């Protein structure tokens, strides 16, 4: 049974009052603007159709919400009213017609300006000095936020110029620019803080901080759009003139403000700003039209909460409410695991949205998004739609908090997150199809396997065609495939490709190939990959196609089969393993077969490799898909590592079970405690077999003993410790004795290169210095042994001189290398 008009009106008043409190007092909107506007318009229609239902305390007769009580109250000398809204061209035409009829004018000029999506404020100046700033509140009474407003650089503390009134109230909008909003949220995500839903919330929440220092840390901005009380002075007789005068007195005024004539001028402005909306540095939710003539404004007057001479023309809503039907994981090109909400389709900003990003697991936890929830989804321009909040009042019973899956939905590898990071990642770098293109491009890059000529477009099409599924497949590429690829990429459409192919196909059997190509849909973005996947035999007409490039690329692929260990390690694309880490791993362990089977704590034996990098290496090599990709690379691709050698003798230093326990980052296990433990329980198996009491008897504090027992019971830890002990024994068996180490002349010294060298490339100089034992760093410090400065050396040279670090020129470096190499 439908509610009566009186019951419906009461329900609408309750919902609108609740929404007003959330929006104006708590700075935490619970429903999208479009839902709010819809309820207000429905209530206005009910009160028009049933005048007996109209009440003085109705939201249709009020502005904003009462002050929160957290700040001193300020009574506005001139009320800060709201604006009526228009949502269609017809409503704008009616607005112009009403003014025309009331004033009897045929040519009406309006000041048009963007409707900022921020917080309305009033600034009071006495004798040119800023003395008071207040929020709108309920239109009559606002909150004193003067201290916070003083932290906004856009707001002048003293008026510029001259001839300002004795008392001047300036009305305007405090907002947060999009770039500042994104920077704030990025910092919050990294620090585990609260991520704000949108720039409007960010501005309002920042301005209502009790500590002005917090407001100062959040970059807020301001635009002036009008005036309130004015005493002891005159303002121009047009609104546009007043804005120009405010600009001369030091207030920011939007450059988008424009004077237009009549309905056509207003609608033209609306469409122009609408087209520019997504590219603006700030959020707007519409435009505002104001009769430019102040005398006309006074003649038009006001209704209860809004002027008759102004109206807001709203854009299509960028936020809507809908339902979460599922939460799935999407794996990006670099392995980032991004949760995506699958939504009941809803129109947002003129586009049907059925998916929205949830950014990361921390964001889901902060919002507490669950399957079945009603949520607010936001879409601004080309930005990916995102879920910004949950409507908790609509949450169905029986929902449960969402948990990040443990396995990649694409390849089944473990999904991992390093300590302190916001993003989770699929650890199947080499084997995950979602990461395939990125992994192959990195593998072939100049500083990795250096396969010159294999560009991104080639890789993309080869992968899409299913010809290259792993890095090992690069070594299966043939000259025919590459020439076929070039024809495919050069063709504008399937018919053009068929014509090009016809020149290189044998007469017998070519018809089937050409017909298959001609059937492809040229409007399908994947048609080229489909064409390349078509099997074909070729008889290349070398007068009609260049072949040298393909021969060169095949030669580059063949040449990459003989590679150094550091290049192969870097080419694998392991998270956190750059060139310098790959070089260090190669120098210290010497053999890919050893490295690929090491438990992660042993990687920490290498200087400058900490827990984060070591765990990343461990996760990578634990994935069966990655191990299979390496096997294929060595067996199918026939990649041969040219510089295999024994592990460094330096690994022997302090390498024992006690150190393994410390490197495993077991809570409370220090070197001294580990030595006591191993003295009582020699061997990893003995430690695994022991119980809490034996750990205490070995000298561990009770809480440390309990923590060790819990750690050993955790999945995989015991097996890892046993494997680490076995790997340690293998290293000790293979590494030469410490006495056999021949120290380089630069062992233990740190060198920095800066500027341009005439006779050496930066890479060549670095390689030769490292061969003599030096560590080549990218930054200068007191620990730097010397700096090699070429021409156009910059700040590094200046810093070296200020710290008293020795500076060598290129001639001295070359002489030293000639003497010691």
UniProtKB/Swiss-Prot annotation:
Binding site for Zn(2+): 408, 411, 426, 432
Cofactor(s) annotated in UniProt: Mg(2+); Mn(2+)
Residues the entry annotates as binding NAD(+): 33-37, 82-83, 113, 136, 173, 290, 314
Gene3D superfamilies: 5' to 3' exonuclease, C-terminal subdomain, 6.20.10.30, BRCT domain, DNA ligase/mRNA capping enzyme, Helix hairpin bin, Nucleic acid-binding proteins
Keywords: DNA damage, DNA repair, DNA replication, Ligase, Magnesium, Manganese, Metal-binding, NAD, Zinc
An annotated Gene Ontology molecular function: DNA ligase (NAD+) activity
Record-linked CDD domains: BRCT_DNA_ligase_like, LIGANc
Root EC class: ligase
Entry-linked PANTHER family: CHROMOSOME TRANSMISSION FIDELITY FACTOR 18, DNA LIGASE
Listed EC numbers: 6.5.1.2
Reactions performed catalytically: NAD(+) + (deoxyribonucleotide)n-3'-hydroxyl + 5'-phospho-(deoxyribonucleotide)m = (deoxyribonucleotide)n+m + AMP + beta-nicotinamide D-nucleotide
Function per UniProt: DNA ligase that catalyzes the formation of phosphodiester linkages between 5'-phosphoryl and 3'-hydroxyl groups in double-stranded DNA using NAD as a coenzyme and as the energy source for the reaction. It is essential for DNA replication and repair of damaged DNA.
GO cellular component, one term: cytosol
Taxonomy, superkingdom: Bacteria
Protein's recorded name: DNA ligase
